[in-house]
Regions:
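Charged, low-complexity intrinsically disordered terminal segments
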Residues: 2-536
Length: 536
């Protein structure tokens, strides 16, 4: 600092101010120091740039993540909204075709249908109903859009002389497949049916249910749905014998889409099990019942005020709001005030496994309760055939013993024996016929009817798949009442020469059948002779 001051003081007086200012400036740094400084500055600047780029990328990433979160939340909300919408549709009872409780048809026509085997005849004044074959053909002739059929048997195309009606039915189904009519068929996986294979090749949709895997049982359901309007429910499957030597009974509903709305869900339940070896833990809401024994369908049947619902078995196949078959039968017996008439092929209150047989009290106990506690008259009409279990007679004797010392206890049992007629036939007649069997499965009371697919055997209800129908009517005196018609059918059979009060003998008495008419295709008629009073 002193040197610079000396230089400034010793400067010539002729030097300008600018020259003195330049002399006073510090010396320039060396080139090497300049390069180091430049590199350092460039490095700092590059780091600043990298930091700014990273910050911008981070902002973009955070922004993208926020957008993804928002989009995911919107998708979730949309999914929940769709689920709620479909849930609301299910609650309203609407199916995929737009059919709901609000727009379905509940003013219906109903008809009993029967198959009466050739050679089984009644008196001329007996009631008769629409032949089963004619009823089925009517349904197929009415079909314009769809035919849904559940059946345990599919044996229509047989060469036996009495199988002609089955062959005609098979030909009609084949014809429908070429008319742009949707055909959906359900059968048990054990069914080895050429009929099903032929229909499948023509475009029919076939579903096989593996009941053995589900519940160690088999499919016994038998019902039709045509055009989402018409329904058949009854004992007969698609077997040529059901149109020949088997005595069958069922009902057909016409223009009854409200009943279809509920029954279609059982069909959909069966279809949902296609390719599955186990039953789902929870059923879709679209398979929930629409009506049950607490919320019955209100409808008109032949202009008669009625209530109805369908039930299902086994309990494993009963989603929410679907009545179990046993509960449906209970509701009919509990509502009876005067009488309960039951017609089944087999009555055996036993549950059987491969190792043991145990008493199954569900229905047997309910009958005893009605007899003893409510003094309701009970009539049991049971088929007698080669497969009748000897224990049946023990249980019947046990039931009869209840009424021996109890006032107002009325129980009567008869066995409907059609094999006796075959035993009395000539050798030539036997070669032309198969053993006949009464396969009716129904119950009728003074206010209700139950038509099902099961005999009253424990394993049927606990293991097998079957469907039942309950109809309630207040006025059962009108001839249009399906309850009255079914009661008349029961009494026709009860008072016929085929029904015997005592245990049938395996040695047939052919003299009682000598006056029977020769086999004919005429409808059944009624035998009014030899009636016992109902109050007995």
């Amino acid at each position: 600092m002193e040197i610079r001051q000396h230089e400034w003081l010793s400067a010539s007086p002729h030097e300008g101010f600018e020259q003195m200012r330049l002399k006073s400036r510090p010396k320039e740094p060396s080139p090497s120091l300049t390069r180091v400084g430049a590199n350092f500055y460039s490095s700092v600047k590059q780091q600043d740039y990298s930091a700014s780029v990273w910050l911008r990328r981070k902002d973009k990433l955070e922004h993208s993540q926020q957008k993804c979160i928002v989009i995911f939340a919107l998708v979730c909300c949309f999914a929940v909204l769709v689920a709620l919408i479909f849930s609301a549709v299910d609650i309203m009872g609407e199916d995929e075709d737009g059919l709901s409780e609000k727009n379905c048809q509940n003013k219906c026509r109903i008809a009993l249908v029967e198959n009466i085997p050739e050679g089984l005849n009644y008196s001329e004044d007996a009631p008769f109903h629409l032949p089963l074959f004619q009823g089925w053909m009517n349904l197929l002739n009415m079909a314009k859009k769809s035919v849904d059929i559940v059946s345990s048997h599919w044996d229509l195309n047989h060469t036996h002389p009495s199988a002609c009606q089955g062959q005609r039915l098979f030909e009609k189904l084949l014809q429908l497949t070429s008319q742009n009519i949707e055909i959906k068929l359900v059968s048990d996986v054990t069914a080895d049916s050429k009929v099903l294979e032929a229909l499948k090749l023509k475009g029919a949709e076939v579903t096989y249910m593996n009941m053995t895997a589900y519940n160690k049982g088999r499919l016994q359901s038998s019902f039709w749905i045509v055009d989402k309007q018409h329904v058949y429910i009854g004992s007969a499957g698609l077997d040529w014998r059901s149109l020949g030597q088997m005595k069958e009974l069922g009902v057909i509903f016409y223009n009854c889409s409200c009943l279809v709305l509920d029954l279609q869900r059982i069909f959909a339940l069966y279809s949902s099990l296609k390719f599955k070896s186990r039953v789902p833990q929870t059923w879709s809401k679209r398979l929930y019942g629409v009506y049950d024994n607490e919320k019955k369908l209100q409808l008109q049947l032949n202009e008669t005020k009625s209530q109805a619902f369908v039930s299902n078995s086994p309990k494993l196949f009963c989603p929410k709001n679907r009545s179990f078959d046993i509960d449906a039968i209970y509701s009919v017996i509990d509502d009876a005030k005067q009488y309960v008439y039951i017609a089944v092929t087999d009555y055996l209150p036993i549950s059987s496994t491969s190792t043991k047989r145990t008493y199954w009290p569900d229905l047997d106990g309910k009958i005893r309760e009605a007899l003893v506690l409510r003094s309701v008259k009970v009539r049991l009409l049971i088929s007698f055939w080669k497969e009748t279990d000897p224990l049946t007679f023990n249980f019947i004797s046990s039931l009869k013993a209840i009424c021996t010392e109890i006032a107002n206890c009325s129980l009567k049992v008869k066995f409907f024996d059609l094999e006796r007629e075959n035993a009395c036939a000539t050798k030539g007649q036997k070669n032309q016929t198969f053993p006949k069997l009464n396969r009716n499965k129904y119950m009728v009371t003074d206010g209700a009817a139950y038509i099902g697919n099961f005999d009253w055997v424990g394993n049927d209800f606990t293991q097998n798949a079957g469907t039942g129908l309950v109809i309630n009517q207040a006025d059962v005196r009108d001839n249009r009442s399906i309850i009255k018609q079914l009661k008349d059918v029961f009494e026709r059979d009860w008072y016929s020469p085929y029904a015997k009060s005592l245990q049938p003998t395996k040695q047939p008495n052919c003299s009682n059948l000598s006056k029977l008419k020769t086999p004919s295709n005429q409808p059944a008629t009624h035998n009014a002779t030899g009636r016992e009073p109902l109050s007995a």
